[in-house]
Amino acid sequence: MQAQQLPYEFFSEENAPKWRGLLVPALKKVQGQVHPTLESNDDALQYVEELILQLLNMLCQAQPRSASDVEERVQKSFPHPIDKWAIADAQSAIEKRKRRNPLSLPVEKIHPLLKEVLGYKIDHQVSVYIVAVLEYISADILKLVGNYVRNIRHYEITKQDIKVAMCADKVLMDMFHQDVEDINILSLTDEEPSTSGEQTYYDLVKAFMAEIRQYIRELNLIIKVFREPFVSNSKLFSANDVENIFSRIVDIHELSVKLLGHIEDTVEMTDEGSPHPLVGSCFEDLAEELAFDPYESYARDILRPGFHDRFLSQLSKPGAALYLQSIGEGFKEAVQYVLPRLLLAPVYHCLHYFELLKQLEEKSEDQEDKECLKQAITALLNVQSGMEKICSKSLAKRRLSESACRFYSQQMKGKQLAIKKMNEIQKNIDGWEGKDIGQCCNEFIMEGTLTRVGAKHERHIFLFDGLMICCKSNHGQPRLPGASNAEYRLKEKFFMRKVQINDKDDTNEYKHAFEIILKDENSVIFSAKSAEEKNNWMAALISLQYRSTLERMLDVTMLQEEKEEQMRLPSADVYRFAEPDSEENIIFEENMQPKAGIPIIKAGTVIKLIERLTYHMYADPNFVRTFLTTYRSFCKPQELLSLIIERFEIPEPEPTEADRIAIENGDQPLSAELKRFRKEYIQPVQLRVLNVCRHWVEHHFYDFERDAYLLQRMEEFIGTVRGKAMKKWVESITKIIQRKKIARDNGPGHNITFQSSPPTVEWHISRPGHIETFDLLTLHPIEIARQLTLLESDLYRAVQPSELVGSVWTKEDKEINSPNLLKMIRHTTNLTLWFEKCIVETENLEERVAVVSRIIEILQVFQELNNFNGVLEVVSAMNSSPVYRLDHTFEQIPSRQKKILEEAHELSEDHYKKYLAKLRSINPPCVPFFGIYLTNILKTEEGNPEVLKRHGKELINFSKRRKVAEITGEIQQYQNQPYCLRVESDIKRFFENLNPMGNSMEKEFTDYLFNKSLEIEPRNPKPLPRFPKKYSYPLKSPGVRPSNPRPGTMRHPTPLQQEPRKISYSRIPESETESTASAPNSPRTPLTPPPASGASSTTDVCSVFDSDHSSPFHSSNDTVFIQVTLPHGPRSASVSSISLTKGTDEVPVPPPVPPRRRPESAPAESSPSKIMSKHLDSPPAIPPRQPTSKAYSPRYSISDRTSISDPPESPPLLPPREPVRTPDVFSSSPLHLQPPPLGKKSDHGNAFFPNSPSPFTPPPPQTPSPHGTRRHLPSPPLTQEVDLHSIAGPPVPPRQSTSQHIPKLPPKTYKREHTHPSMHRDGPPLLENAHSS
């Protein structure tokens, strides 16, 4: 005797890996078939897979050996009517299997596994049958869940959605959870909280669109599920009978679809400048057409006295009950109890229109829209008064709320209110046990009092979608101290998925009764006080029981209609845009989640892209924006206009031969089809063509400015458009064109209003109007930074997306295609070179230190203003070869300024990681660094092909364009917010006209800068050369604090105190002796004596990355700086002219300094007295100095090097450069930007692309430091004196290739810590190794 086989465990450790994930890809395909506009996450599909395997286990337990065995098991196990539909699908699959595989689930993989499950081999046809049943159930689950997800206005199906939706479906709950007492669907509090507070106009419109979509589905249910059986059986029900029951429901459906279409079109074509969609005209147009009149006659018919009796008389006709029962189980009860409630829904919906119009009029911010809404309200006054008169007589007696008439649960409304209501009811019931109501129910339906027949006890009933709770009232009963104050006491509860509702006829024992039959065949009978009360309870109970069945009937009906009523389109030979989709003309993204249910295009022909740009079935605003930004890379503007005009002119489909014969016989077979074609194809396509035109002229008018004929053609085309629906869109486009023309002729007018007045302009040595005196040291550093920021912000905001797509700024017509971008690149180049020139042309060491210090102060204000482009311009100048090598200059920069410079440099490290984090953390206005965007665009353009080949056809790679458009979109998000700063026209003009190169060629100029750098600080000099002073005015900085701070204006826009980084302010001493002394008012130079201990400067420069109070633009009340008093009157170079305040009265004055002697044994240049002597014709030579035992730290940290002996890395990356002169130099690099200045670490032309090294960048000349031990590199000995006059500059390597291999420039750090006290009169010599000769 054969041993009985053990049951197969699908989820055991041994078997689970064989099944896990097997069905997920196919289930994704099934989901795409039932809801193509939604997506499913992996958890959801895995959960459906578990349910399907659970179902497979149930089917296999019957040990089927034939298809009839499986069918018998389905009939016994599956609830009605799903068993009938599943069997029909399975039989159809077996028939189709003979020709091809119609199934999505993998039959070929499941068939061999079934042998292992059953223990014996079965016929392949049986496997097909089983898989077909499984696929039908999976499609049913996903269809149900998709409907729920769309109701709550989501676009992705989750595991939680499946649990919630299945809990509301009695059929599926019976199938999968027959033996489970209650299912925990998780509390709805996990979902999004409902929006509270006052709704805006746009909120009202969005909510109404969701409501009307659900309302249209209800109307479809009434017409296609309930009305159709009456219409199709003319023997039982005459046309007059149908009219008496359903009145003008078809007209109401047509109006609702038309209204929704108008509102969707209006929302789609709303101007970006408009405060909200202007839907008033939608209501006004329909109201003037009297389109709402059917509601009044409908309400009169449905609410007239005796309607319910005449309705019941139709159902009591001989054969009527049997006919309705034959349609489906429970259908007769649904018609009797559910249909009358559904027929009231249009009445309540119409009353809602009147309330909505008043709310929209109140919230509207557009005067024209307000007027339209007012006109619509006036036009509907007759309908409103008629409706209110009818309803006041009939609905008042019914005392029904609108929710009682709703067939579908309102998941999108008041989730939190539903949870709150459930919790309140549960708290009011004494003796509650088990899970909370909110864990097994989604919504509260109704409550009331019923009598339990037999015991004749009154019970207070609470009905939810998942539970029916019967309670006894606690009123009137004496309560013991400490007893519960609950109003009700629990008697019993019924799970709605486990009961059957049975109508009971009136008898002598009870009247107005119904029966609840439990699973164990026991039953409970409840009776109501009146027939109307019974009807209300039965309507709610029957709706809960048969809702899923009725929804499935609606889905099946609508699917059949779609298949039968496919719209006839013109021939592709006549109308190119009617060509069917195929892999030869369009490809969609597979792994990208579509937004709002719209597929995302990966590649396509131009014709298909234009078709989807103006698609009749949906609008895709993102695609419109992306297309108009990027189309120039594959299509010219004139071609695009020709294509959209061709798209607009749609021919009607030609009649077939059968149609011609029917027309000859006097029939009109095409009239209905043509009406539908015009309504569902021509009108939406033409509206979307106009929408594209509006976006084009609004956001890309430069196409028309460059081509007058293009604008002429557009205006001619718009002038030919006719039709009432098109009128307002034509007017809108015409107004935009006129506005753009005026702006083009008169120049753009910027009327920007700020909440507070901009800060006053800061002046230093130069005065307004004296532009000839403007220079780096004569202008105020704050105002230099402000005016440069305003200028760079204007340049940044002027760059159009079309200047970037296709890397057109690197190509031949770049002056035409990228004028604004080139302006910005050239300005960046000029400013960086100007900074370099200012530094190296300042020969005197003290003055040069002041210049560098002033530039760092400008950088600090750039940081405060969030001008990242300016910050990296300064970093670029400091890291250029001529400046980077100036060791002696950087040694005298205060450590705090070095820290600022280093932190600015860190922004560009690690692929600009810190910069990107900082950019995301601040609020506009700001000026981002453009180089990153250009680098990303260039990599995207070069790393992706222009076309994709499919079946020998070349398709435009639109995915590549979308990626570029995403980058340009990021650029645009920072182009909207202007700076609240005052333009100083003279300073602005000074920087606009900067031309540091003069008439020199770039190579010549960069050679000059480097040679000048070698002249002022030669390589390994014996003594450092001395030079006379260049400037006659004081070098002392005015600081970076506004001179006249006042509330609201003393701070720059968007101070960095909002940054997430919180570093407390602490002063970094220059040396051990300086740790007790404060910083001077200007960079430490030989002219600056050490300040008194404890004194601080108004110009102390702190890190812009410090804490909230590190900003130098705070008021004096919260500053971290000690007050400094400066003398009034003319400045003097005398040390005694500077007074520092310490405490209240103590003002230390340094003693007078004796004049310096001229002999060679004189002290080092570090003595202030030497420089202060004004009577010396030429500076004396600097004598050698004893070498110090300590080494200076490098300007950048060397902690990351692999070994201390390794050569240091090259200087940091530079911001962008673009040539100022001679167009022929543009082609000298792969990107056609400016070639590198000689000796730089990185060429300026390639600096906008920091991660793309150019093969044309020569290595920088080596600049050995005079401090050999600090570099950890061997220094070549000096064999002879260096003659400065004989230096002609370093050897210049060829641009393309070179045989010389010049080593890279070693890095420096801005954290130079002095190993000796700060410079003062008696300090040590300036140079190390001064005595080595």
Curated annotation (Swiss-Prot):
Result of altering R1131K: In a patient with Noonan syndrome
Pfam families, A to Z: RasGEF (PF00617), RasGEF_N (PF00618), RhoGEF (PF00621), SOS1_NGEF_PH (PF22697)
Organism expressing this protein natively: Homo sapiens (Human)
Protein name as catalogued: Son of sevenless homolog 1
PTMs per UniProt: Phosphorylation at Ser-1134 and Ser-1161 by RPS6KA3 create YWHAB and YWHAE binding sites and which contribute to the negative regulation of EGF-induced MAPK1/3 phosphorylation.
Biased composition (Pro residues): 1208-1217, 1252-1264
GO biological process, one term: Ras protein signal transduction
Record key words, sorted: Disease variant, Guanine-nucleotide releasing factor, Phosphoprotein
Biased composition annotated in UniProt, kind: Basic and acidic residues: 1310-1323
Designated gene of the protein: SOS1
Modified residues (Phosphoserine): S1078, S1082, S1134, S1161, S1178, S1210, S1229, S1275
